[in-house]
């Protein structure tokens, strides 16, 4: 909780922060409370801090007073800052003077209210140690009293940079600096929202280091929308540019600084090269599906960054379909494929792939298993399919804790370079999580999967089950699949780019005929029946079918068959 703005207390001096370890980011206020501008931790005053505040004595320093330093009593004088390239006239205009107290020289910056009264000062010695006098509150801006509205105002981190910009503009145009530096830029700018809103443009000329760039992003978010410009300098800050002969570059930024654009928003005008590169990249060209050309006609394939949902009733051919696509993409197209088949062991997955590749149902034939081991074909088949290290499998049968699974999928993409990852199936991930709210769990998981696919450019194929209909025939008996039949959360259909449904009547007179229906395709907008495939019991493949009968004749067959082995 940030209470630093609500208190009438005044800032005393900087102290170390026990929470984040900053040596001087923490601030002690007159009522004893502290606030760290680095980690933003607010701590209420206790007896210890109240006692320190009452003494107002920073470590190694001299007792301070609530009163500002008097120009005459402090042997004050206005002087050019020759080492900084700043004239006496500029210092006098801004209220930046030299004091000599107890034989020690100080630079003093007067902070004034809009009536011109000095309310606080920032005092700096030759070793760059700072302290303040008076009521140095969170809205402190050096030079604020000089300007009231206009076309542009420049905001710098420190007083020296502010004086530099004033010098180059002959003290004619608005410029201020942050009273508490870059670490408090957001708080200072937020506290001065109405003041900054008087200007048409607000130019943030912060330091070019990491802290300065971070401060720009934080401050810009709390300033009037559409008015913020960001200066980019060739040196660390405005004064360093001035000392190195880059005055022209400073003024160029005053007049032509680019607008601040928040993360996530880009100008289309800036995308020419990115679009040119994308048009010729593999991500913009779809990976084609096998088994049914109509899928490609309606979807134009699967593109990088897309989530492809495959669904059907139980035992309808989902796993066979995705294994077939994996084999096609890995062998014919040379893509690297990751498979997380959570309902089977990696041995079973590999055996099915070997069988498909050689057009035999290897796992279902004990005699064939023995034969290829004895005659040496196993090694030949294995090397032909896996010798080029194209396929990578998730080796944790029935273990699908969400974060662990996502970490493994991320490794498949970033560490192994997989172009396609297949997840079979999403329901087992949800059931393994232990969450009581399945809908919420699917929402979170789909959001993470979508973000993963989009951010990495991988094609992510996910298998999803269907919910049981309330009445009427089951999906396993040829019931057409609707996009609302996906089991779980609406996120399944909302976050998927393409949804492919497989339909067949396991008990009909054509139990091996599979209707392919496109329920959604974000890329083309095309939906509907894509065609038919037929399961070949000899080869284990879903092959293109010339069947072109009406959908009703496919879905309403009433004969029964026991062949449900997919």
Curated annotation (Swiss-Prot):
GO biological process: DNA replication, synthesis of primer; viral DNA genome replication
Residues bound to Mg(2+) 2: 237
Region (Binding to viral DNA polymerase) location: 550-566
Catalytic activity of the protein: ATP + H2O = ADP + phosphate + H(+)
Domain spans labelled Toprim: 151-238
Record-annotated site: dTTP/dATP binding: 361, 465, 504, 522, 535
Repeat listed as a keyword: no
Cofactor note: Binds 2 Mg(2+), one of which is catalytic.
Pfam families: DnaB_C (PF03796), Helic-prim_T7_N (PF21268), Toprim_2 (PF13155), Zn_Ribbon_Prim (PF08273)
Domain comment quoted from the record: The N-terminus zinc finger domain is essential for delivering the primed DNA template to the DNA polymerase. The central core domain contains the primase activity. The C-terminus region is responsible for the helicase activity and binds 1 Mg(2+)-dTTP.
Assembly and oligomerization: Homohexamer. Assembles as a hexamer onto linear or circular ssDNA in the presence of ATP or dTTP. Present in a mixture of heptamers and hexamers in the absence of DNA. Interacts (via C-terminus) with the viral DNA polymerase that is bound to DNA; this interaction is essential to initiate leading-strand DNA synthesis. The priming complex consists of 2 DNA polymerases and 1 helicase-primase hexamer that assemble on the DNA template. Interacts with the single-stranded DNA-binding protein.
Family that this chain belongs to: Belongs to the Teseptimavirus DNA helicase/primase family.
Protein name: DNA helicase/primase
Organism listed in the record: Escherichia phage T7
